[in-house]
Amino acid sequence: MTHKIREVYIVHHSHTDVGYTDLQEQVIYNQANNIRRAVELIEEGLEKGTNQKGLKWNCETWYCVEQFLKVATKEEKKTFFDLVKKNSIGLSANYLNFNDLADCEYLTEKIHDMQEVCAKEGVTVKTAMFADINGISMGQRDAMLANGVEFLYTNIHTHHGMYPLYQNQKPYFWENEDGKRLLVWSGEHYNLGNALGIVFNKNVNFMTENYFGKAQGDVAGPLEKLHSNLIASMEEYEENGYPYDFYITSVSGVFSDNAPINPAIADTVALFNEKYGEEVIMRMVTLQELYDLIRDKVADAPVYRGAINDWWGNGVGSTPYAVKHYKEAVRLNRICDRLEEKTGVHNAELVKAYGDNSLLYAEHTWGHSATVTNPYDTMVTNLDMRKNSYASKAHEAAAMRKNEQCHLLGDILRYYNLSGKVKAVSTSHEKRVFPVEFYVETMSLPAVKVTDDKTNEVMEVQLSTHPRGVLVSFLAEFEPMEEKTFTYEEQPAPAHTLFTRTAWVGAERVRDIINTYDTESYKLPYGMENDSFKISWKVGEGITSFYNKKAEVEMCRPGLETFFTPVYECTKIRKGVYEERRLIGRNIRGLHAEQYQGDLKDVKVLDHGPVFTRVELVFDLEGTYYSSVIIKMYNKLPKIEFSYHIAKTLSEDIESVFLPLALNLPDAEVSIRNGGVTMRPGIDQLPGTNMEYYLADEGLIYRTKDQTILVNTFDTPLLYMGAMESHPILLCDNREENNKRPVYSWIMNNTWETNFKMDLSGFSEFRYGVEIVDNGSVKEGMERLSDNDKGVVTFICG
């Protein structure tokens, strides 16, 4: 039989997992050595004229090249780049295989640095590849486009995931909002070549059996088996309308991640071509060669815009406490970028320490392959600790950078004076009223007067408790990026005597009588209200109303979608911790999953003053030792801040904890930022992509014809959209109705059976904010959401 496919292009690489197979440092060391070994083998093949002269090696991630260049001799570096120019070694502009936590601003700089390093050697990198991961953010795409990358070769692993466009081995152009395009070849699994038999494996692997069935007494040799597997695959392609005369496959040196180069592949290619070359030719290629070979043949590929939404983003929910720490590191870095606009001082060393560690944390691997099946193993613990250290080191550098910036702006680094001066710095490019808060480390500060030094306005102040003393809060209006200085002065304690001529409070000091003297206190056990919002609750029933007074709309939704009310979900283990999780596929729960909604048991009024009111709603919730939502409502701002306090218990079951963010706004359009690029979930995506859950940079916005409602998710990026039950998975079809599904903050989960943690136990708070603003553009809403994330920087300056 004559086949249309005449050439097989083989991309030999090592899939970069910083972890998974071994300790991170060992993996990094090994990957640098893989490149050194590739240089040696290819050079030897060229010198001796052996089959290895045709050996090609592709560096899947630039990070591994970066590590090699750190340890390589001058001669090794020269030889390496000579082989790149000879198309014996291929380079990829993919820095690491990320999830959507990656800081794309810093990533853009790293890819720029890569191009500068290569340019000095006479090389321009126009290609990139990723393997295993189920997508990259639009911000990562734009980081590549901004640095001259033209071609991306993808190798998606469909374990709990799927490739886009309903089909693999398919080209398309991925276009951004500026009209720039990246040619993408959406390939097969990165071990397809191993499954075919390009690398002989005595132990038949599961992928070969998945693709080609189990051997039935077949005693054919390795070369013959490779031929029969390849022909079977080619026939499948051609029978299904595959239009090209080439076939692309990746291959690893062994069937494993972080695999070394395998010189035997060049021998296999030579032997195959000698025996079967008249039928089909095998050819090892670099990424640049692959791009050159196919680009004209796929010039008519379709053009798409939107996200390749990452199926593996849910893994970040397995480490909610470290992710919270990481999110604050990113926030601190963004704040420092704004403060630098004022100081003009740039600490490149701290920026690099933050950035390099933040990218290592956002690398997709997370933990050891036995994280779930053997959580007791020392290596599992070591990888987990090391992974968390990347977030911590990023946070350390960003926090130190903020200390320096504040000191330059006048921070006296002392918090003890009961009277002094405080500076507040807006990080917003918009004129706005912001809450301003600072604390004084003291046992007692009975009252304080705060005066705006510029206007002499006496601010309305509220004092409340702080873990280290007394918190001082007030509201102030700021011009864009304005620094304001305030004088604060200790005052005598106000006299606390009860007004006794009106029936409003009894001798036991309980304020529960409806009256006109104090029109707020008697309502607080049942709800809270300002000019924009009214929230009502009832012990035993929960939240009964979340009313938008400006739009005159009841925003509270029924059932599990009720705002401010945590939800715990559990799929009991019946078939073992691994198998039960494997069976959920692309769902996030099993068929027998059960949901438990928080049962409101108590209400505590924590603060009530002229600036804000703060109330704690205490819930009984399965899967937790303690569960409460603390709501802080500002009296004179259309703004609410709330935090979920959780003491999570330990379980081997498949668990998730959610906080509903669904609002009864049927005509609203929901938008998020993903890698710095705005998108509408369910709409602005490539067809056939994941629309079950998303990673959002700073939260989401609901945009109606009259208002924009901003919902900040400060500490937890994962959003789930849709039904709270196991269901057939609908891949994205870009319909408007996809954007109308209920939204939940998916705080934590342990749905994976391999490298993402099963243990969710711990204490923490997860913070959120809701603000109503006049309707503007989506861009304006997103900028304000980002401003809310950064807030005002305040410190004592005198």
Language-model-derived ranges and their functions:
Residues 5-17, 21, 168-413, 427, ...:
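Active-site and substrate-binding clefts of carbohydrate-active enzymes
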Residues 14, 147, 155, 278-279, ...:
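Beta-strand/loop-rich accessory regions of lumenal/periplasmic or secreted enzymes
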Residues 1-101, 118-119, 173-177, 331-338, ...:
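N-terminal catalytic cores of secreted or lumenal carbohydrate-active enzymes
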Residues 14-33, 60-70, 92-107, 123-134, ...:
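The substrate-binding groove and active-site-proximal loops of carbohydrate-active enzymes
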Residues 107-146, 232-249:
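CE4/NodB-like, metal-dependent polysaccharide N-deacetylase domain
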